[in-house]
Regions:
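Flexible loop/turn segments at secondary-structure boundaries
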Residues: 87-89, 170-171, 218-220, 233-234, ...
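Non-heme Fe(II)-dependent double-stranded beta-helix
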Residues: 15, 25-78, 82-189
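Catalytic core of Fe(II)/2-oxoglutarate
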Residues: 239-314
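Conserved catalytic-core segments centered on acid/base and nucleophilic motifs
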Residues: 152-153, 199, 209-217, 224-225, ...
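Fe(II)/2-oxoglutarate
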Residues: 1-74, 330, 338-341, 349-393
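Catalytic core of non-heme Fe(II) oxygenases with the double-stranded beta-helix
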Residues: 150-151, 176-177, 184-248, 296-310
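Extracellular structured ligand-interaction cores
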Residues: 78, 161, 205-211, 221, ...
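Short conserved micro-motifs at the rims of enzyme active sites and ligand-binding pockets
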Residues: 237-238, 276-278, 297-303, 318-327, ...
Length: 393
């Protein structure tokens, strides 16, 4: 992130100057610096037809990932993948999400939004395991998309955790207030100011934000508003609470129309917010993805044990069919990829530095063709080994 380190090691409102902010965000994204991108629209990089060819080899994939990481860190802070998901698969997923939302409403437990007025939208919290348990085949077709793995590995490295919050903004739903995202973006200004300046610069590397369009999103439906390059403004977690900065955002944000199946991913420090749905009859649905580093903490708790068991049959079928990359992508979403925290009294590493992770266990089960009962037993045994035992008989 650009901007000088706060002189006392902590940011305060006095460090937030609009002139400095404008110097950071009022620049142009140069397509020539991103050879794998197809276009720049409103300062946002758009990727599409070039990707499959450029990622066909290990070396080519690494080059693309390095470019994506640079785009998120030092570039516009946001990238769009055109046609990232098969629209037919998206429609099947949307049916599952609508059924869950209908059940929430019938039960009187409709979910709201952090940054928008109540009643604007319908949301499913913690949708990964809900989706997998309800429709494992649809889940597998959906999360087999390589785009999530490509950019998640580029920004976070391996063993990341995907969480999901499908969100429907109804006609007339008002825009969100401009903000940054989790972690420091989910604190009030005083809480954020308690963290030292270096933490403000490091925390965006713990999370990747994404959104998959589940319907066509012309501008009148209110697709997400972005301020490209704003992730580079170091005191931004303090600044976005200021009306001076949100006012500037309101006058200079950009919106990109999206087609069903397009996906946008962005640095969580980017100033952004969902737009007003001015359409008469379009319920704008997006699957909001939050991908967390193995070194961080996700917002949603995911029952990865149940999700792994639910997908096991599908994983074995796809492995037998030679769809190995899809299986790896799905295991990265379904299972816990990091071995810690654990109870090292019980879960001791044997012949290696770390215990076996849940993702490694699931991959072994797929490769070796375990039956369902063996997987359930091994998952339960692993969970027991990982559970703290102090004070228990």
């Amino acid at each position: 992130m650009s901007a000088k380190t706060a002189p006392r090691g902590w940011y305060t409102p006095d460090d937030c100057r609009l002139s400095d902010f404008r110097a950071v965000v009022e620049q142009t994204t140069d397509l020539a610096g991103y050879p794998s991108a197809d276009d720049v629209q409103s300062n946002v990089l758009v990727y599409g037809r070039k990707l499959s060819e450029r990622t066909a080899t290990i070396a080519g994939r690494r080059e693309v990932q390095a470019e994506l990481a640079r785009a998120l860190l030092d570039g516009p802070g946001i990238v769009v993948f055109a046609g990232a998901f098969d629209p037919a698969v998206v429609d099947r997923a949307s049916e599952v999400f609508r059924a869950i939302i209908d059940e929430q409403q019938a039960a009187g437990s409709a979910a709201g939004d952090h940054f928008a007025p109540p009643g604007n939208n319908d949301r499913i919290w913690g949708a990964v395991d809900k989706f997998a348990l309800r429709a494992p085949e649809v889940f597998a077709d959906y999360y087999a998309s390589d785009v999530i793995a490509l950019i998640s590995e580029a920004w976070l490295g391996p063993a990341y955790q995907v969480t999901s919050q499908p969100n429907v903004v109804n006609p007339g739903g008002q825009a969100q207030v401009a903000h940054r995202d989790y972690h420091l973006g989910f604190m009030n200004r005083e809480q954020a100011m308690a963290y030292p300046a270096h933490a403000h610069r490091l925390t965006p590397a713990l999370t990747l934000q994404g959104a998959v369009a589940h319907c066509d999103m012309p501008v009148e439906t209110g697709p997400t508003m972005y301020l490209p390059h704003s992730q580079k403004y170091a005191p931004g977690y303090v600044a976005f609470h200021s009306p001076e900065f949100t006012g500037y955002f309101d006058e200079h944000y950009v919106q990109l129309p999206l087609a069903k199946g397009d996906a946008a991913f962005f640095n969580p420090a980017l100033f952004h917010g969902a737009g007003t749905n001015r359409s008469a009859d379009v319920k704008r649905m997006a699957n909001l993805l939050q991908v967390s580093s193995a070194f961080g903490r996700a917002m949603d708790a995911v029952d990865t044990t149940a999700t792994s068991a639910a997908l096991f049959g599908t994983l074995k079928q796809r492995w037998a069919a030679g769809r190995e990359q899809e299986v790896r992508n799905l295991i990265a979403v379904a299972a816990e990829g990091y071995a810690f925290p654990t109870n090292l009294d019980r879960d001791q590493p044997v012949g290696r530095m770390t215990p076996v992770s849940q993702a490694e266990l699931l991959a072994q089960a797929v490769r070796e063709g375990w039956d369902d009962a063996q997987l359930r037993d091994e998952l339960a045994a692993q969970q027991w080994r990982r559970t703290p035992a102090a004070g228990k008989q």
